[in-house]
Amino acid sequence: MKTYSAKPAEIEKKWVVIDASGLVVGRLATIIAMRLKGKHLPIYTPHVDCGDNIVVVNAEKAVFTGRKKDQKVYYHHTGFPGGIKERTAKFVLEGRFPERVIEKAVERMLARGPLGRKIMGNLRVYKGPSHPHEAQQPVALDVAALNRKNVRN
Protein backbone atom coordinates (compact mmCIF):
# COMPACT_ATOMS: atom_id res chain seq x y z
CA MET A 1 0.00 0.00 0.00
CA LYS A 2 1.38 3.40 -0.99
CA THR A 3 1.61 6.35 1.36
CA TYR A 4 -1.17 8.84 0.74
CA SER A 5 -0.04 12.26 -0.48
CA ALA A 6 -2.66 15.01 -0.60
CA LYS A 7 -2.90 17.10 -3.75
CA PRO A 8 -3.65 20.83 -3.48
CA ALA A 9 -6.79 20.43 -5.62
CA GLU A 10 -8.42 17.86 -3.31
CA ILE A 11 -8.01 19.81 -0.06
CA GLU A 12 -11.07 21.47 1.46
CA LYS A 13 -10.07 24.40 3.65
CA LYS A 14 -12.28 25.21 6.62
CA TRP A 15 -12.67 28.61 8.25
CA VAL A 16 -12.16 28.73 12.02
CA VAL A 17 -12.67 31.70 14.36
CA ILE A 18 -10.90 31.86 17.73
CA ASP A 19 -11.66 34.35 20.50
CA ALA A 20 -8.32 35.19 22.19
CA SER A 21 -9.86 36.84 25.28
CA GLY A 22 -7.93 35.68 28.34
CA LEU A 23 -5.98 33.02 26.41
CA VAL A 24 -2.26 32.48 27.01
CA VAL A 25 -0.32 33.70 23.94
CA GLY A 26 2.11 30.78 23.58
CA ARG A 27 -0.50 28.08 24.05
CA LEU A 28 -2.83 29.82 21.60
CA ALA A 29 -0.02 30.17 19.06
CA THR A 30 0.83 26.44 19.16
CA ILE A 31 -2.78 25.49 18.47
CA ILE A 32 -3.02 28.03 15.64
CA ALA A 33 0.29 26.87 14.10
CA MET A 34 -0.79 23.23 14.21
CA ARG A 35 -4.12 24.02 12.53
CA LEU A 36 -2.50 26.29 9.91
CA LYS A 37 -0.14 23.47 8.91
CA GLY A 38 -2.98 20.93 8.89
CA LYS A 39 -1.37 18.55 11.37
CA HIS A 40 -4.75 17.91 13.01
CA LEU A 41 -5.97 16.24 9.80
CA PRO A 42 -5.46 12.59 8.80
CA ILE A 43 -4.51 13.73 5.27
CA TYR A 44 -1.62 15.94 6.48
CA THR A 45 1.11 16.23 3.86
CA PRO A 46 4.26 18.18 4.83
CA HIS A 47 4.84 19.87 1.45
CA VAL A 48 1.22 20.94 0.81
CA ASP A 49 -0.79 23.78 2.36
CA CYS A 50 -3.58 21.63 3.81
CA GLY A 51 -4.43 23.63 6.96
CA ASP A 52 -7.41 25.78 7.86
CA ASN A 53 -8.02 29.49 7.42
CA ILE A 54 -7.96 30.95 10.92
CA VAL A 55 -9.49 34.21 12.15
CA VAL A 56 -8.43 35.41 15.61
CA VAL A 57 -10.50 38.11 17.31
CA ASN A 58 -9.88 40.09 20.53
CA ALA A 59 -6.11 39.77 20.11
CA GLU A 60 -5.58 42.72 22.46
CA LYS A 61 -7.06 40.66 25.32
CA ALA A 62 -4.54 37.79 25.03
CA VAL A 63 -2.33 37.39 28.11
CA PHE A 64 1.18 36.30 29.03
CA THR A 65 2.02 34.15 32.05
CA GLY A 66 4.47 35.24 34.71
CA ARG A 67 6.38 38.45 34.04
CA LYS A 68 6.72 37.90 30.29
CA LYS A 69 4.63 40.98 29.54
CA ASP A 70 7.45 43.13 30.97
CA GLN A 71 10.45 40.88 30.27
CA LYS A 72 9.78 39.56 26.74
CA VAL A 73 11.56 41.73 24.20
CA TYR A 74 10.97 41.93 20.43
CA TYR A 75 14.03 43.04 18.44
CA HIS A 76 14.26 44.48 14.94
CA HIS A 77 17.07 46.13 13.02
CA THR A 78 16.82 49.34 11.01
CA GLY A 79 19.58 48.28 8.62
CA PHE A 80 21.95 51.00 9.77
CA PRO A 81 25.05 50.33 11.91
CA GLY A 82 24.04 50.14 15.57
CA GLY A 83 20.39 50.20 14.53
CA ILE A 84 19.03 47.40 16.69
CA LYS A 85 15.73 48.39 18.28
CA GLU A 86 13.74 46.66 20.98
CA ARG A 87 10.19 46.74 22.29
CA THR A 88 8.67 44.91 25.23
CA ALA A 89 5.54 42.80 24.84
CA LYS A 90 3.69 45.27 27.08
CA PHE A 91 4.60 48.15 24.74
CA VAL A 92 3.34 46.21 21.70
CA LEU A 93 0.11 45.02 23.38
CA GLU A 94 -0.76 48.53 24.55
CA GLY A 95 0.25 50.08 21.23
CA ARG A 96 -1.53 50.58 17.95
CA PHE A 97 -1.22 47.00 16.63
CA PRO A 98 -1.57 44.53 19.52
CA GLU A 99 -2.39 41.75 17.06
CA ARG A 100 1.30 41.61 16.09
CA VAL A 101 2.09 39.73 19.31
CA ILE A 102 0.01 36.75 18.16
CA GLU A 103 1.19 37.07 14.56
CA LYS A 104 4.85 36.97 15.61
CA ALA A 105 4.31 34.07 18.02
CA VAL A 106 2.68 31.97 15.27
CA GLU A 107 5.12 33.09 12.56
CA ARG A 108 8.08 31.93 14.66
CA MET A 109 6.50 28.49 15.12
CA LEU A 110 6.23 27.89 11.37
CA ALA A 111 8.88 27.15 8.75
CA ARG A 112 10.61 30.18 7.27
CA GLY A 113 10.49 29.06 3.64
CA PRO A 114 8.00 29.65 0.81
CA LEU A 115 5.39 27.26 2.26
CA GLY A 116 5.63 28.88 5.70
CA ARG A 117 5.01 32.30 4.18
CA LYS A 118 2.04 30.96 2.22
CA ILE A 119 0.59 29.33 5.35
CA MET A 120 0.91 32.63 7.28
CA GLY A 121 -1.39 34.14 4.65
CA ASN A 122 -4.16 31.90 6.00
CA LEU A 123 -4.01 33.63 9.40
CA ARG A 124 -6.03 36.78 10.06
CA VAL A 125 -5.75 38.51 13.42
CA TYR A 126 -7.98 41.37 14.61
CA LYS A 127 -7.64 43.34 17.82
CA GLY A 128 -11.37 43.85 18.35
CA PRO A 129 -14.36 41.48 18.48
CA SER A 130 -15.46 42.02 14.87
CA HIS A 131 -14.02 40.65 11.63
CA PRO A 132 -14.97 40.93 7.92
CA HIS A 133 -15.12 37.16 7.27
CA GLU A 134 -18.74 36.40 8.22
CA ALA A 135 -19.49 35.41 4.61
CA GLN A 136 -17.14 32.42 4.96
CA GLN A 137 -19.23 31.15 7.93
CA PRO A 138 -16.29 30.33 10.22
CA VAL A 139 -16.74 27.67 12.89
CA ALA A 140 -15.88 28.78 16.44
CA LEU A 141 -13.05 26.88 18.15
CA ASP A 142 -13.10 27.03 21.95
CA VAL A 143 -9.39 26.90 22.84
CA ALA A 144 -10.12 27.48 26.54
CA ALA A 145 -12.05 24.20 26.71
CA LEU A 146 -9.16 22.15 25.26
CA ASN A 147 -6.98 22.52 28.37
CA ARG A 148 -7.45 24.45 31.60
CA LYS A 149 -3.94 25.92 31.28
CA ASN A 150 -4.87 27.64 28.02
CA VAL A 151 -6.77 30.40 29.82
CA ARG A 152 -5.91 32.90 32.56
CA ASN A 153 -8.65 34.70 34.44
UniProtKB/Swiss-Prot annotation:
It holds the Pfam family Ribosomal_L13. One of its GO terms (biological process) is negative regulation of translation. It comes from the Bacteria. Keywords: Ribonucleoprotein, Ribosomal protein. CDD domains: Ribosomal_L13. The keyword Nucleus does not apply. Signal peptide: none annotated. GO terms for molecular function: mRNA binding; structural constituent of ribosome. One of its GO terms (cellular component) is cytosolic large ribosomal subunit. InterPro entries: Ribosomal_uL13, Ribosomal_uL13_bac-type, Ribosomal_uL13_sf. Belongs to the universal ribosomal protein uL13 family. This protein is one of the early assembly proteins of the 50S ribosomal subunit, although it is not seen to bind rRNA by itself. It is important during the early stages of 50S assembly. Part of the 50S ribosomal subunit. PANTHER family: LARGE RIBOSOMAL SUBUNIT PROTEIN UL13M, RIBOSOMAL PROTEIN L13. This is Large ribosomal subunit protein uL13. The lineage of its organism: Bacteria, Pseudomonadati, Pseudomonadota, Alphaproteobacteria, Hyphomicrobiales.
